[in-house]
Amino acid sequence: MPVRKTALIKTLSVGFALLLIIPCVTAGEPDLLREENDYRVSMEQMHLNQKTRQFIRTYIRANREELDEVKEKSRSPFAITDSVFNAYELPVQLKYLAVIESDLKTKAVSRVGAAGPWQLMPETARLLGLKISSHKDERKLYDKSTDAAARYLKDLHAEFGNWLLAFAAYNGGESAVYHAIHMSGSHHYWQLQGYLPAESRTYVKKFIATCYFFEGRSSLKEFCMGS
């Protein structure tokens, strides 16, 4: 059936209008509004508002070179983390926290004394069974520190009930999350985030951005839906 001229003009007009409102996406930059072959879960369903989406775009754009370098060297460490997290029945995407913490560097040490790929503090590491002495620091052993981090993250998830709160606690401590819950009267991350330290809020968004960079939008569903 031939297309009527008025219908064609209307279709073209709508299409042109859409071009005006959809943000321009640079080649190679993630498009969080339209991802090919993945329309099942919208960003709105995952509570990722425009401000969060813009953070993800900006973060990946600013850190693309560094993220690409980590990606190139990630096969061996990610094989370890995948094995450990599968053994503990945890999402393998938790491995991207180590990207945020240290760029997967086993010898990384922070100014406050956190060390290893998971940047564990000495007291936390010892509670998790890692040995630290002048001769040996198991926080810097990828397999042992990953096992400790997995157990810690599993405990945090059991304590707070969702992953985004667990990430905030991993970064800023459980007391900061409990304070945010008390002040907001909510256990939902997106409702209480305003009461969290700015560093923890940024940390959670960095995880979302890094996870998206490595795996795409569908990988975020488990972490953001219902959080």
Give short role names for the model-derived ranges.
Residues 63-71, 83-84, 105-114, 131-142, ...:
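Second-shell loop/turn segments in exported
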Residues 218-227:
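Surface beta-strand/loop "capping" patches
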